[in-house]
Each structure stands twice: as structure tokens, then as C-alpha cells.
Amino acid sequence: MAERSFYDLSIHYVPDGKNTAEELISMAKHLGFAGIGLSNHSTAEGPLKSDGTEGFDIFRTVELVASNPSKLHGLVGKYRNKVDVLAVHGGDEGINRAAVENSNVDILIHPFTPKGSGLNHVLAKSASENNVAIAFDIDSLIMSRGGRRVHSLSHFRDYLALSRKYDVPMLLTSNALSIFGLRAPREIIALAALFGMEKDEAIMALSETPLKIVQKKRHDKNYVCEGVEIFEPSPSVLGDE
């Protein structure tokens, strides 16, 4: 796997997490990542880190937390041009739906609700159409025990089946809150097998998918905010001078 470049796009630093950006970067480099996304929740906004180090990429990630779809749309407009990766913290049916229906959202993370996995065929189809990746956060497996771990595995199997059926981008992430939550790419790929992800799928979810996310031309000069975009009139509209 040496020829692959691996990226973890959801690593929380202070104030969300317990470690500084510098400490997390150092550990991630040691574990073999080519780059990471430094994240905070929108409710715990800290300084957005984006300075890379030689041979290592650092991306600005925000995990939006909203109480309703209307507030989520407002947060998307606020943060889209400020970050490299825009994730939505799900867990509510309305928020999950609003996230996957919005092409300005990159990732839906923690979609499971008290009633179930939080995803269905309709939402998976919308995620595919709008190129919104579904995150499989490995901390749900390594940081939980008993019934909670069983539920996480069950939800991940549901996400996997829906993602395969509707060609939804799949993303693997540690969702680490400290250096102790980080895992090497090889370990994450191995853990993904617990819920049925094939090795080639896991490699893509940790390499090609995150790279495609950060390479999106989200900061287009014509993008103003959610629901507002500038269009240049064509010559036929302007008419002949």
C-alpha cells in the first residue's frame, strides 16, 4: 500500500479535541498519512488550521451542528468558502435529509438516529446525486463496547449496502478526539472489514474519496452563499453592441 496516499478528514483538535493541531499532525505523519483534515464542530469554533508542512497536507474541516434544516442551510452558507471540507453532524432525520440534498455539503457523519441507522433508499439516492459522502467513523467501533458497538456495526452494514446500491461515496475516518484515537491506515482498513467493507473499497474510502473531496472546486468565484450564485450573461442575452 506504499504507493497510495491516505487521508483522514475528520480529526478534532482543541477546543473540540484534547490535543493541539501540531501534536495531531506529528502523530498522523508518524502513522503514515499523507494529510489530515483538522476539524472542530461549528458549536465549538476554534482557529481554522490550514498551514501544511513539507510533504504533508493539512485541510480545514468543519463539522456543522444544527437544530433544524433551516439553520443548517445558514451554516453551510457561512462556512462553505472558509473551509476545505464541510461535514454535517447528522442524527436527526431532517438534518440528514437536508445534508444529502445539498451539493455544497461534502460529508454526512453520525447519521444514525435513536430509531435506527438514519439512512434509507431515498436519502442514499440523494447523497449519490449530490455527491455527498457517507462517513464510517471508526471511533464508533474502537471507543464503544457491548450493545453500542453492536449497533454501530449494524448501522455501518446498512450504510455499506445502501452505498453500494446507489454508488454513494464512502469515507473512512478515525474521527479522533486525541492522538490516542488515531489509527494507521492499515489498521483502519482492517477494522472496516468488521462490517463487511472489502479491502479495495476501504482503500478507496481512505485515499481516492477524501482526495476527490478536497479537490472539489468549491470556492468558485461565482459562489456567494447557500442558494445564491452569480451567473455571467451570455452574449445572446446581452445582444449585439
Swiss-Prot record:
Catalysed reactions listed for this entry: Endonucleolytic cleavage of RNA, removing 5'-extranucleotides from tRNA precursor
InterPro entries: Pol/histidinol_Pase-like, RNase_P_comp-3_arc, RNase_P_p30
One GO BP annotation of this record: tRNA 5'-leader removal
This protein's record includes keyword Cytoplasm: yes
Cellular compartment(s): Cytoplasm
Disulfide-bond pairs as recorded: none
Keyword field: Cytoplasm, Endonuclease, Hydrolase, Nuclease, tRNA processing
E.C. designation(s): 3.1.26.5
Transmembrane segments annotated in the record for this chain: none
Pfam family, one: RNase_P_p30
Molecular function terms, GO-annotated: ribonuclease P activity; RNA binding
Keyword Glycoprotein: no
Cellular component annotations (GO), alphabetically ordered: cytoplasm; ribonuclease P complex
Cleaved signal peptide residues: none
Stored PANTHER family: RIBONUCLEASE P PROTEIN SUBUNIT P30, RIBONUCLEASE P SUBUNIT P30
Function, in words: Part of ribonuclease P, a protein complex that generates mature tRNA molecules by cleaving their 5'-ends.
Summary of subunit composition and partner proteins: Consists of a catalytic RNA component and at least 4-5 protein subunits.
Record HAMAP family: RNase_P_3
NCBIfam families documented for this protein: RNaseP3Mthb
Family indicated by similarity: Belongs to the eukaryotic/archaeal RNase P protein component 3 family.
Protein name (Swiss-Prot/TrEMBL): Ribonuclease P protein component 3
Organism for this UniProt entry: Methanococcoides burtonii (strain DSM 6242 / NBRC 107633 / OCM 468 / ACE-M)
